[in-house]
């Protein structure tokens, strides 16, 4: 069967112009105009999708099949082009009957053209074929437009669904244009309204806990750029004025204990003339406990020193992925569970904004994994947020899973984050030594987010940084009172 792409080539119909008109009409639709005004960050992300839309439309037109009636009419037209005028005159009745049988738009006009001329000349033959070709071009263009209209409706429906999802999640997850673009890419999955309400719910909870949000931001910024001295910098002499105590004091400021013989009080000096107190005088002299005058004074002098002319290099510290381990034991239920999930959502927001990866592992009796920054990040986040925290605590397995992932090439610069109340058994010696090796040799950093003030110090001592967020009732009331 004839394809629409072949028909367009045969009739020299340009589908590119039709595709561009359709895309312009789609972008100018009132729904998108309102959305762009409300969420300007997502405008660029949607605009970046236009090449993909264009390619999808080309593919749709290329693979579309031409209706059998139109295919038969096109074949008849091609055969008629090969006929001479005498042959065309002989075949004309069959051609007219075929057009009538196919309900061709050209059928009625063709018969009128033939009836209006008693003799079929070469010029009439050419005119007949030209008008027939125009009729076929109109039919092909109409077919293209119908298919594009169907695609436009389908595409608009898809875009509206993604706009609804992205519009709901943009205030929660999109901190800049980069995050907005990644959020738009992740919104392509098949999600229902009830699904992403989990993210909205924990986003609202995070806004109610600004201290928790700030804690996540501090952890995300913890690998800041720093300056380091240059070894090859040239030295230059600098002079500056410094203030120091004067050699000749200006006034008496009080009394003090010291060994300053020149400023002894008369009663202390009198002890030297008493034999019984002489040794006591020397003892207090050695111990600097003689009462003396305290004199006060200061002066300025010039200090000369050398320092490098350009003494610092800017050492940009890379910000790698997050590997987050979340304790899902029974003691982490309730408010602790809400805080842990909201904290992971805050890290996901940071990862999207800074083009980093965010990998979540839940540990209790088994380990469950989610990647919140991948193409299916929203679906993964929903699955994570819908998990219930019930089980035991196996912190050693958590560390082993982290260390296994850190040894892979794509996670070599990752930061490991463990969220727990750290009420657990001590870590085995082999785990502790392996963690210290990763910290020392590979510069991996381990962060602890402590949800309790009663975590075991022996466990927490292994971490580079400890971020405390006490979820006890007293701390919660204090935070609420401060707000």
From Swiss-Prot:
Keyword annotations from UniProtKB, A to Z: Chaperone, Cytoplasm
Subcellular location: Cytoplasm
Disulfides per UniProt: none
SUPFAM superfamilies in UniProt: vWA-like
Gene3D superfamilies hit by this protein: von Willebrand factor, type A domain (3.40.50.410)
One Pfam family here: VWA_CoxE
Keyword Cytoplasm found: yes
Subunit details: Homodimer. Interacts with RavA.
PANTHER family in the cross-refs: PROTEIN VIAA
Homology family: Belongs to the ViaA family.
Protein name as annotated: Regulatory protein ViaA
Organism: Shigella flexneri
């Amino acid at each position: 069967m004839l394809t629409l792409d072949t028909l367009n080539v045969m009739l020299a119909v340009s589908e590119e112009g039709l595709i561009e008109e359709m895309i312009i009409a789609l972008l100018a639709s009132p729904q998108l105009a309102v959305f762009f005004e409300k969420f300007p960050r997502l405008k660029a992300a949607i605009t970046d999708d236009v090449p993909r839309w264009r390619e999808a439309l080309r593919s749709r037109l290329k693979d579309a099949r031409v209706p059998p009636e139109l295919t038969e009419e096109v074949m008849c037209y091609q055969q008629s082009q090969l006929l001479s005028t005498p042959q065309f005159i002989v075949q004309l009745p069959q051609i007219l009957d075929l057009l009538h049988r196919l309900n061709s738009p050209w059928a009625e006009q063709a018969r009128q053209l033939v009836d209006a001329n008693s003799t079929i000349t070469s010029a009439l033959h050419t005119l007949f074929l030209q008008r027939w070709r125009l009729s076929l071009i109109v039919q092909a263009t109409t077919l293209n437009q119908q298919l594009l209209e169907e695609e436009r409706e389908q595409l608009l429906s898809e875009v509206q669904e993604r706009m609804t999802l992205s519009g709901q999640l943009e205030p929660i997850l999109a901190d800049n244009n980069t995050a907005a673009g990644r959020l738009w890419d992740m919104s392509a999955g098949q999600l229902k309204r009830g699904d992403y309400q989990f993210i909205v719910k924990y986003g609202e909870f995070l806004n109610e806990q600004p201290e928790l949000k700030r804690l996540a931001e501090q952890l995300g910024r913890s690998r800041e750029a720093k300056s380091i001295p240059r070894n090859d910098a040239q030295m230059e002499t600098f002079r500056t004025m410094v203030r120091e105590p004067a050699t000749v004091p200006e006034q008496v400021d009080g009394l003090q204990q010291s060994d300053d013989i020149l400023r002894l009080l008369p009663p202390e000096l009198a002890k030297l003339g008493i034999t019984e107190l002489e040794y006591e005088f020397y003892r207090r002299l050695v111990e600097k406990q003689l009462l003396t005058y305290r004199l006060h004074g200061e002066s300025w002098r010039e200090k000369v020193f050398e320092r490098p002319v350009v003494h610092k290099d800017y050492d940009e510290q890379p910000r790698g992925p997050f590997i987050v381990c979340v304790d899902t034991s029974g003691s982490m239920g309730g408010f602790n569970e809400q805080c842990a999930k909201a904290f992971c959502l805050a890290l996901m927001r940071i990862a999207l904004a800074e083009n980093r990866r965010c990998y979540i592992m839940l540990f209790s009796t088994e380990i469950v994994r989610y990647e919140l920054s991948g193409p299916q990040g929203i679906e993964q986040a929903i699955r994570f947020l819908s998990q219930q925290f019930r089980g035991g605590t196996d912190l050693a397995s958590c560390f082993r899973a982290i260390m296994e992932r850190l040894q892979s090439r794509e996670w070599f610069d990752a930061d490991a984050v463990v969220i727990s109340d750290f009420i657990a058994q001590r870590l085995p010696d082999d785990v502790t030594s392996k963690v210290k090796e990763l910290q020392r040799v590979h510069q991996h950093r381990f962060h602890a987010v402590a949800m309790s003030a009663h975590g075991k110090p022996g466990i927490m001592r292994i971490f580079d940084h400890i971020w405390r967020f006490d979820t006890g009732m007293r701390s919660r009331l204090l935070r609420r009172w401060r707000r």
